[in-house]
């Protein structure tokens, strides 16, 4: 986002200094953990969606159980999409804590890139899933269950690894910003 556009998104009379809190707000923390649970649920329990797609490809009717679980997967994905939008609005209006002073600048840039990619995936994964499930778009289905899903798993692993490095190597209290801080 351009530096000239950002002031337009800030509350009236606020500057970036006012928007950079020391910790995430309770709504931000709640959204983070709720979305983490929903995303992990959908990443782990996607088999029924694949069964439904394969049944349709074979010209068969999917089992009622597979349809039920595929619908749950779809509804959870739509919830992630909606919560991602709320989370983005809160992030623009409230801001986020600054990177710890001890963090090397190159890793601070990498963290911003990773967080930006997370936000993109909060929208791209559900939208591609909607395209595949509700509109039968095979390309959307491939992108949804292939590269985007793999990228989400990779980002989750990097996110956890970065947290562990902050906590145990640099001894920075980054985890408390999203838990109790």
Please annotate each region the language model reported.
Residues 2-181:
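Membrane-embedded alpha-helical bundles that constitute the cytochrome b-like, heme-associated redox core
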């Amino acid at each position: 986002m351009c530096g000239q556009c950002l002031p337009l998104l800030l509350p009236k009379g606020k500057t970036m200094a006012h928007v950079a809190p020391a910790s995430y707000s309770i709504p931000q923390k709640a959204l983070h953990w709720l979305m983490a649970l929903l995303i992990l649920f959908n990443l782990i329990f996607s088999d029924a969606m694949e069964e439904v797609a394969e049944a349709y490809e074979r010209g068969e009717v999917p089992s009622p159980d597979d349809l039920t679980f595929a619908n749950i997967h779809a509804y959870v994905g739509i919830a992630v999409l909606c919560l991602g939008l709320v989370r983005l609005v809160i992030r623009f209006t409230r801001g986020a804590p600054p990177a710890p002073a001890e963090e090397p600048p190159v890793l601070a840039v990498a963290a911003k890139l990773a967080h930006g990619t997370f936000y993109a995936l909060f929208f791209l994964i559900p939208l591609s899933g909607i395209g595949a499930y509700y509109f039968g778009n095979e390309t959307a289905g491939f992108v949804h269950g292939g590269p985007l899903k793999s990228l989400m798993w990779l980002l989750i692993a990097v996110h956890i690894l970065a947290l562990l490095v902050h906590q145990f190597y640099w001894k920075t209290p980054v985890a408390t910003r999203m838990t109790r801080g």
